């Protein structure tokens, strides 16, 4: 499909051996795609490899153009935005300054438009622009890192563990925003340990465990047939 980010045959090694083995995932435009799996499945390693942070084998095809092996800034410039696990930001700077840093590669006009777009998605941050990022609540910090990723108006957005450490009410606020982003034409990959967080907003889903894909298909199939989670996602007997 035109506009798709395709991760093809990705293998990632850390330490003694591979933690991701020959994984292929399609992230089409205008949809939220879920990547599910237990802790240690290799999901975060895959995302870091896509972003050019970890060495890997395979292809990262952005609308047919292979970005594999490119430097992180080249990958971002091609329209791939990644929100890694852990809510990484400059905690000693204000919210406004963090957004300015995220705009460093943009023209003045694009930076102004991107910032306005991000604050439209997360109006809660408008009142906190002068607050230090480190003083924000966990939910506000997650909004900030999402806003930082979105100021550049990416074609694809990869979000790792959106719900980690957040109260359910905060997650309920954030997840629909990803659907709004997708409806604007962005291809969104939502990586989650907790299946229920991602399945409600996703159209397609992949289940990963021990570095391999064990299920790929419509998210509705996992919602309607929860036993599939127990046979693929829950090989270790743990439910999410």
Predicted feature descriptions by range:
Residues 2-240:
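Glycine-rich phosphate-binding loops of nucleotide-dependent enzymes
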């Amino acid at each position: 499909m035109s506009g798709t980010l395709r991760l093809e045959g990705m293998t990632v090694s850390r330490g003694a051996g591979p933690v991701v083995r020959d994984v292929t995932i399609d992230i089409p435009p205008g949809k939220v795609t879920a990547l599910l799996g237990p802790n240690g499945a290799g999901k975060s390693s895959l995302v870091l490899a896509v972003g050019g942070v970890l060495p890997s084998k395979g292809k990262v095809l952005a609308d047919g153009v292979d970005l594999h092996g490119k430097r992180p800034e080249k990958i971002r410039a091609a329209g791939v935005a990644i929100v890694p696990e852990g809510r990484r930001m400059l905690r000693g700077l204000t919210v406004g300054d963090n957004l300015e840093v995220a705009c460093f590669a943009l023209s003045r006009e694009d930076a102004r438009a991107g910032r306005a777009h991000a604050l439209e998605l997360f109006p809660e941050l408008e009142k906190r622009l002068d607050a230090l990022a480190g003083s924000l609540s966990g939910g506000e910090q997650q909004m900030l890192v999402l806003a930082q990723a979105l100021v550049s108006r990416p074609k694809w957005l990869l979000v790792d563990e959106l719900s980690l450490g957040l109260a359910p009410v905060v997650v309920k606020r954030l997840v629909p925003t990803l659907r709004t982003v997708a409806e604007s034409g962005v291809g969104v990959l939502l990586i989650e340990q907790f299946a229920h967080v991602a399945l409600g907003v996703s159209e397609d889903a992949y289940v990963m465990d021990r570095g391999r894909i064990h299920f790929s298909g419509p998210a509705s199939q996992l919602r309607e047939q929860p036993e599939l989670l127990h046979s693929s996602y829950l090989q270790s007997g743990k439910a999410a």
